[in-house]
């Protein structure tokens, strides 16, 4: 973060400075976890489901934080903001904020983040926005790998992509930062536009329009309206703006009419009209893709170290952004080929000592990413001549389409040749999945929780089998992967003792 005096922060965000030396400086980025606050940091007093950040201001200050952004005076150094009242929004940040105290802090945080971007932009900071229904985090991670080889780069950890994580990430930029990669999510129309207002992007990539958050939006067309807000926020082509669009998705390709930026296309299907496309795609025995990359400057062989055929499209988007930013194509190819998964529980592939392979893709799930995970599992199982086990939870936020989409998932399992399903949990979606799978004749086990699922899988799988673990975040299905790994370690320890 760029150093700022307490008085300047109060002026920028329009709050009242209390119990603080006006000349005291914030020299480190913001923190909303008091345990991470340290000398020179800015503490964010945000309300949550179980605790209120205002109750932890004193702890943050005692740990060295310079001051807090707060919505009420608790007798500690702070910039105090006026509560905004209950917000009419489906954003997660406002779910436990009846008085609008968190909304006031977040508005101030966004204002401060915009000030930082405006301060750094004349010095050469390039902001890149990435959005889409699926693949945002993987693409963001790939792009960060490429750009870090070119200069100091700030990118969010994991999926810090909403009204909290986005400005939080922006404040990590300083005068040395050359690239700021912003992952932008949405649960409604206007959300991406809001994030783009905080950190106006020079280059924006839209990956796809799928069915994630379908229950919030109502239709794919409304999702496209929201995702396209990113390209609307780009500067003109004359001012250096570039929109990177997926030629294989009609709703994304149509966004070209919504921007005055330069438009370039990528295509994992090898569409001839795409500026960046892949042909000759092959997968190895753990579903890592190799392909021929076609670019405006020639053809290049690419071998990815991440898993899943769907990663080809993500890689193409990252490649296109980097090349359009001026990075040499050969350097881009070298960096993308060396990239390994940086965010946990996203296509993490682990082979246990017994030979069992666990594909942990449990961070989130929607119909598109479910199919991609199943495809990767099947590819790996086929290459190993082993059985495939789908350990699945619900796909959340599908609204009225919940039952239909989970029925379709069961049908996709059958069509793909997956015979073993462990359906975890008691949600409506999981029940619909299990009931349809049983109707279709799949070997289906209904597990009430992650422990029951792990115990069943451990007792049933063969030593070289492949297990996919995937569900929406709320299901915490990564516990199945953790339990299976721990069980294997226990067996190994006992074997060593017996030996």
Predicted region positions:
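Conserved RecA-like helicase motor-core motifs
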Residues: 151-158, 266, 443-446
